[in-house]
Amino acid sequence: MKVDGGVGWDLATVAAQAQELEEMGYSGITSAETSHDPFLPLAFAAQQTSRVDLITGIAVAFARTPMILANIGHDLNAASNGRFVLGLGSQIRAHITKRFSMPWSNPAARMREFILALRAIWANWYQGEALEFTGKFYNHTLMTPFFAPTNTEHGAPRVFLAAVGPLMTEVAGEVADGIIAHAFTTEKYLREVTMP
């Protein structure tokens, strides 16, 4: 069984917290997007650890574009020598439209396309495939060499998706590398709703 532990947002102490969690035998270190950015603590943790996965648990996908998260994911995966896991979640309509001032519609379909766009961007960077992603919600068709990362030895990070309902769970099964269950999810719910 793998067990992850969370770090706080105090950048003066997060590296020591991460090192302690790794020494205690945790499998991964998570950083959540609540009152602070979820990525910066993991950048600090990457410098003080060598074994544990570094996971956003979660980062709000719809507050950003796929290109922004492709860059962040690439940089953290490179900084951690391939240990970064991009944990994404949709959040709810009110937060996306009122707090982040971003569009909201069809969250499961949007998330599916978001992750496929990420993968298309990374395929351009890591496999040299042409960037020709055109969808209903996202379009990424321009990538010149100046904007493509050159430190690509670790490849793309894994993508996990937070899912509660059946539609987002289907998306996770289709396009993500793993699923993040909500903290209130029971064993019965996982068995009867999520797993089928």
Annotate each predicted stretch with a short phrase.
Residues 1-196:
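Active-site-adjacent structural elements that line small-molecule/cofactor binding pockets in enzymes
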